[in-house]
Structure formats: structure tokens, C-alpha cells
Amino acid sequence: MSTVFLILSVLYAWMAWNLYRPAYDHPRLSILSFAFGLPTGELGLHVIFWQAMTVAFFLLIGAVSGFFGALGFLLCAASWGAIAFYYFESTAAQKEVISGLEEGLGEGFQNQINEALRQQFAEEPDRALIRHPFQHRDPNVELIRNVHFGDFGQRLDIRRPRTSEPNAQMPVLLHIHGGAWTYGKKDDGQGIPLMNHMAKRGWICISSAYRLSPSGTFPDHIIDCKQAIVWIKEGIQAYGGNPDFIIVTGGSAGGHLSSLLALSDGHKAFQPGFEEKDTAVQGAVPFYGIYDFTDEENHFPHDGMAKILEDSIFKMALIGNEQVFKEASPRFHISEKAPPFMIIQGTHDSLVPVESSRSFSKMLREKSTHKVAYVELKGAQHAFDVFPSLRSEYVKFGVEKFLAWTYSQYLKSV
């Protein structure tokens, strides 16, 4: 049993090592690195607790003995120290977020925020949420499930303050889930910490479903997102929302779709049968999105993403169909009329290279007449915001500030 314990200890040591040195260069290894890195990093104290419980079990049965037992125990102790250091180091996100917002919006941006909105800002992470990361319901938030929209049986969920008034004219936040355009659901946990937080701040938050590949083929995904915008503009007033102020957000594939939606208002190929409908939004907050399907600048170190796109999403090769892939890429829709953006990316994302987000934000700043904030989080893995953690709490607070700033500019203009 000492050998078994040592093998388990080596696994724990690799999990800690993976936080600092994730795999980037091989498609399957990068996915494995993400699958272990996300929970180990963002739920670090929980992981340490459960690992300690397994070590306690081995101690009870006398398996931690001899050279192998001592070596295994030392590996576990070192791993826990490394995980704890990584976890608490993520508090740097507080400064990273504010720095990114100040660079993009201006150092005095918080003074431009409506006083009533500014008074709602939280400064300290919600420790209860962090202790119970899988608790998705909030007693102060009303959840309305499975509202139908669009032409293909799509559904969306609505979160709003439980005390909201029907004619409240609340600003709207639309969340688009990720999942490599092939899996994921509107209610699988993605974006819920942010949506619950903003609903308690007087926003209507919507999470919408869209057709997935391989049964769906691009542009089905973005068409469904556009139809969600049309429904919001035509139907959200009945729920107390303001159809004239919509911010769109999402992570990974949702980061791609939210960016593309924000940059392609009126693009007829994405609005078949409703070409004349208004699908404009007032801002976008993409997390770790994919912005260039052609990878023109060679940011991806392997062909894993290209294979997903060719085999499942487009069902055609990139070579010979470059224009199709470009049309689906937010990068090639950037113009001077792009709305305000807040782009969020981790440096240790093993699925989406940080360089791609840097390039996208740079191009947006060069071409758009609106503000662009870019927030880069040291050490953050892909999908870091799925769980309430120290890092995701500070990022959530930063997103709230961006949303409040954008909404304040809107209120000044009406």
C-alpha cells in the first residue's frame, strides 16, 4: 500500500506543478492540463482538504511507512504548499482588474459612474460563496426558466431581482455559454456567479441556449444568439428590462460568440429571415474567447482547435475556405463603430493562447472609437470564473464596474 500511496502522492505533486507549468503544445495534454488545473487552482483549499482526507486514510491503515511512505508524505506536503501559494497569490487579480480598467477607461473612470451604482460596489469577496462553490441559487434572485425564443425551439433563462417591478427598465446582461460550440448548456453553471451578482444589483440577466455542433453547422450558433437579442428587444420589457441597453458576455466559445455578436450588427448572413432587425448591443465582456478562426498570426501551438472547427463546426477545411472562417471571426468584423469592450484572459490558459487576446484587444483599440479595457490575469487557467474563488470574485467586481461605467454613459445620453 505504500507504493499505492506514493503513486497517489506523485499525482498530487503533478496537479500542483500543473498550476505553474500547464501544457500548451499538445491538444490532448492541453485539455488534460485544463481539466486538472481549473479545479485545483480555483478550488485550491477544497482540493487540499480532500487530498488531506485521503492521506489521513492511508495513515490510518498504516500505509504511510518506510521510505516510500515518507517520500509520498513529503510530496503531499510540498504540493499543498504550492497549491495554497497559487490560490492566495490570485488575490493579485484585484489590482490586475483595476489596472486594466484604468488603462482602458481612464484613471478616473470610477468617478464617471453613477453614484447610486457606485454605492453598490462590494470590496471583499463573498466567503460564503467561496465555501460553497456549487450553490447556484440565490434567495434574492428570481429565476424564470425555459422562456421560448427564435425559430428552432431555443430557450433562455431569466434572472432578476426578486423585488423587481414590472416597469423597472433594468439594464440587460446576456450570457452565452461556452463548450467548444459542441456542448454546454444555458444552466450548467457557467456565468451564474456573475449573473446572480448583477441581478442583485438591479440587472436582468439572461442565459440563452443555441444550436450545437456537430448537428448544427456555423452560422447556426450566431444566428441563435442574434435571435436571442431580437427577443430581448421585443420582449424583455414585460419582465422589467430595458430593451435599449444590452451588454453581452460569455466565455470560450461564448467569448467568441459574444464578441462576434457585438461586432456584427446588421450582418445579413447571420440574420437570415430577420435581416432588418436591430441586433446592436451596447457593450461586450468576452472571457478567454477565440477571435480568429484562421489563426492568421499563428498563436495556437497545435492544430487541435483547427480540427474542431473543420470537423465539427464548419464541416469543411480551412484551406480553400478562408473567407468562410474569416467571416466567423470577430477579428475581421472590428470597425470604428465597435461598442465598448472589456476583454478578460488568463496567462496560464492551456486552451486559448494569451497572445490571441492581446492581439484582439490591440486591434480593437486601434480601430474602435469606443473604450476597450483588457484585463490579463497572471496564472489564471481557462474557465477560471466558473467557480466562486478569490480570483473570480475580484474579476466579478471588475466586470460590475465596467458594466456600471457603460450604463452610466448610457444614462447620461438619454
Q: Can you say where each PLM-predicted feature lies in the sequence?
A:
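Alpha/beta-hydrolase superfamily serine-hydrolase fold, recognizing
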Residues: M1-V414
